[in-house]
Amino acid sequence: MAGDMRKITLEKVVLNMGVGQSGNAVEVAKRALGEISGKKPCGRDAHETQRDFGVRKGEPIGAAVTIRGEDAGALARRLFEAKGGQVKGRSFDDFGNFSFGIGEHIDIPGIKYDPGIGILGLDVCMTLSRPGYGIRKRSKHKARVGRSHRITATEAKDFVVREFGVEIV
């Protein structure tokens, strides 16, 4: 029973598409993310004005969707398959998170080419957690997760290899 608090789980998968311009491109990105995840994506606004790119602060320039629970695990398997079952070792940070990019969204199993969408790339960020990690997010009496209870990069890599059969390159 002592090992139950040390069990690592996949907390969430975040898919992000930054298109760099507002208008129809953002709607197309939302449609593509909705098709991939089965959830409704939200728009991401520009944090600051970039005159060179014609982007104003507050203007929607991307789309993102967060998937949690059982759906996150199923989606993660599809995303790893799109990457050929390999993730770079440098994709992992020191806190149990890792990210990678997918160059063409049609590489994901179950996604067919749609001429209305075209071919888009996306960023994938996955967050791992352990029981007890909720103390850093609760509204009252927030606390830090102790150093010995944090997920290290090595533990995260072992989890991904064991749970998803992914090769770390």
Swiss-Prot record:
Presence of the UniProt keyword RNA-binding in the record: yes
Keywords of the record: Ribonucleoprotein, Ribosomal protein, RNA-binding, rRNA-binding, tRNA-binding
GO CC annotations on file: ribonucleoprotein complex; ribosome
Entry keyword Transcription: no
Pfam families named in the record: Ribosomal_L5, Ribosomal_L5_C
A GO molecular-function annotation: structural constituent of ribosome
One biological process term in Gene Ontology: translation
Subunit structure: Part of the 50S ribosomal subunit; contacts the 5S rRNA and probably tRNA. Forms a bridge to the 30S subunit in the 70S ribosome.
Family stated for the protein in its record: Belongs to the universal ribosomal protein uL5 family.
Function: This is one of the proteins that bind and probably mediate the attachment of the 5S RNA into the large ribosomal subunit, where it forms part of the central protuberance. In the 70S ribosome it contacts protein S13 of the 30S subunit (bridge B1b), connecting the 2 subunits; this bridge is implicated in subunit movement. May contact the P site tRNA; the 5S rRNA and some of its associated proteins might help stabilize positioning of ribosome-bound tRNAs.
Record's protein name: Large ribosomal subunit protein uL5
Organism of provenance: Cenarchaeum symbiosum (strain A)
Encoding gene per record: rpl5
